[in-house]
């Protein structure tokens, strides 16, 4: 009940951030990505495209053409989040001109992401990257997988490049860093908590989407993913201990990695109970988790974590469309379940 209440009040607070036109924004801009993220959050939390806030957000996305390639500084993030939002909206849309526009926009977003993939795998901010980073890359992969779930075809080499990239970029400790750096063909550098979770999710999604696809229930058994999950556990105490400020991006990354791989426990850690405890104690009486320029983004990340909503992976062997909305989480036990060390 506490989690349900936090989600309900959090959604109401998110809706208050919507502009009269229907869009959302962060940093005073990035309105396409912010609107896509907010719409995805509302729909993944059980909302309908007929709910006024969601309807206005969807209408704004469909009626305001994306400035393809005209800005470049946020393109991968924004295009990917619009793709995810559309993949959740389209199944609810009746056959109509609006649905056709949504599918056309989703197809164009997928085409852009394919063309923007770096030659060695991964994405950067722009359509013609000279390198990559793992933050943009996790959104690029999520956007492509969302498009696949809505019926868009993605060619095999796209996924093969990603599988190879994430396996070769994995560091000795099992984690990933912001960039993939190599010495004598061996990945070097320092892993981080958020990029390690991103690496697990990206490798899992890529494996589930490649010709030699793994069924969702087998993803956590993959040797590279298993090492990544162990690294996530090691990073948790340093990044999400009781005295640490909440890292909303990290929580969202952990949630996606664990949900895609079907991981309930990271070693001895119940990541959902621990993260939910932190979020429940950080939410203010108005349903807000954050203020300032990151408000929309962090509000959505908190809600998606609590709802355990994510872009699902489906393979030919389990091709029946799954409900993208995760079941309601179980009630939390009273108090903190365990002191973080």
What are the residue ranges of the model-derived segments?
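Extreme N-terminal leader/anchor segments
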Residues: 9-15
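Active-site neighborhood of glycoside hydrolase catalytic domains
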Residues: 165
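An alpha-helical repeat/solenoid feature that recognizes helix-turn-helix modules
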Residues: 1-9, 23-53, 67-160, 168-274, ...
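Conserved, well-structured interaction surfaces
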Residues: 60-67
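N-terminal glycine-/serine-/threonine-rich phosphate-binding loop
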Residues: 18
